[in-house]
Amino acid sequence: MAFEKTRQFLPPLHFVLFPFMAQGHMIPMVDIARILAQRGVTITIVTTPHNAARFKDVLNRAIQSGLHIRVEHVKFPFQEAGLQEGQENVDFLDSMELMVHFFKAVNMLENPVMKLMEEMKPKPSCLISDFCLPYTSKIAKRFNIPKIVFHGVSCFCLLSMHILHRNHNILHALKSDKEYFLVPSFPDRVEFTKLQVTVKTNFSGDWKEIMDEQVDADDTSYGVIVNTFQDLESAYVKNYTEARAGKVWSIGPVSLCNKVGEDKAERGNKAAIDQDECIKWLDSKDVESVLYVCLGSICNLPLAQLRELGLGLEATKRPFIWVIRGGGKYHELAEWILESGFEERTKERSLLIKGWSPQMLILSHPAVGGFLTHCGWNSTLEGITSGVPLITWPLFGDQFCNQKLIVQVLKAGVSVGVEEVMKWGEEESIGVLVDKEGVKKAVDEIMGESDEAKERRKRVRELGELAHKAVEEGGSSHSNIIFLLQDIMQQVESKS
């Protein structure tokens, strides 16, 4: 109530949101936009036309419900940066070299965005920017407004990055990329290899310059929003908040703002399967009998590895949903699925989704009893929020951090056994890391009837209940949104 009373005596807050052009970054940012708009904040999302089209339907429903959200388009300078037309999203890139060009294009957005901001009404009160868009720091400075960073990762990961950026000597002392080390001052004893942590010392050349810009912009930002909740990783939230002088607001799981079926089904993109067809298939299966398999929107595993995954799923003799991403690998895999007889042999107990999956809708169905995931933070949270135990198959980035949080700290899943980081564009040379027996073993471990499996399921269900409580009135995440808005209101008031 105190917040609402304060709200009446000030001009409306206007937050400008800058999502990075990658599906895993855009999805939670759109959720954050809706959560803030539900509190009476005017929201402007700045993105490119291609990326805006991905969340058009979800936002249109939000706008029709009375929320003050608008989307401003800026042209993506693909040609000037050496990219092909349509390469406006990381989904369409397949190498680290192209990513360098992509970041070059991103930084070219500074001037058109500056002009856009000059014309915005009402005057922006605050920027929320993805960590990967350091140019927004210059925008915030130019207009004398606070910039809040959104990373899209866990506090577990953020704390490890914060500590290691200030203790470079630990990584420099390692004799090889495969040698394990402990992160000092960490709440739990967790070992990493050098490549399993996302720190700027792992990069050189153009990539080091990109990372330096991002870290510097992060260090000078006003604060950080994290898509997590207090009861999930309390020690890491506490330590990271202290490291950032208190300006950290954990407001997740933001996915829980998706209440209706359409929002769940279309979160991130239009689903490649009819919602009713998907639900009908799940309704025909026993409770907790289905394994859901999705390795993310940027999975470039070689065909040989995908074949082993498929054969492992077949060997489990359990019903499964397998999401197969688009692109070149899809055509190769689709050919194998058809010609090898895999689809025919498993058709009575499998559902293959070729493209974007209605993941939230699937995970929240009672028939789903396990989730084989790449450990992207969005997917990790969606699985935990739905009370579904996880099988971890990390590929790169923060995903190895998330695996260790899931398996070692939360004890909410089991690892499929992957410890080697996939280097973008070099997947074929890495080859097969998990054979079909390894896949079957992990699935049986997570979905079996051992005491450990039962305890794990109980633990994940409890975490799922805590996730829902966090976003309800009086919950930690619900309260943190109020604290965030009060903080920004005080900033506005001090300048008026």
From Swiss-Prot:
Key words, A-Z: Glycosyltransferase, Transferase
Top-rank taxon: Eukaryota
Pfam families attached to this UniProt entry: UDPGT
Positions annotated to bind UDP-alpha-D-glucose: 297, 357-359, 374-382, 396-399
This enzyme's EC code(s): 2.4.1.-
Gene: UGT73C2
CDD domains, A to Z: GT1_Gtf-like
Entry-linked PROSITE patterns: UDPGT
Protein name: UDP-glycosyltransferase 73C2
Keyword Glycosyltransferase in record: yes
Range of residues in the leader sequence: none
SUPFAM superfamilies: UDP-Glycosyltransferase/glycogen phosphorylase
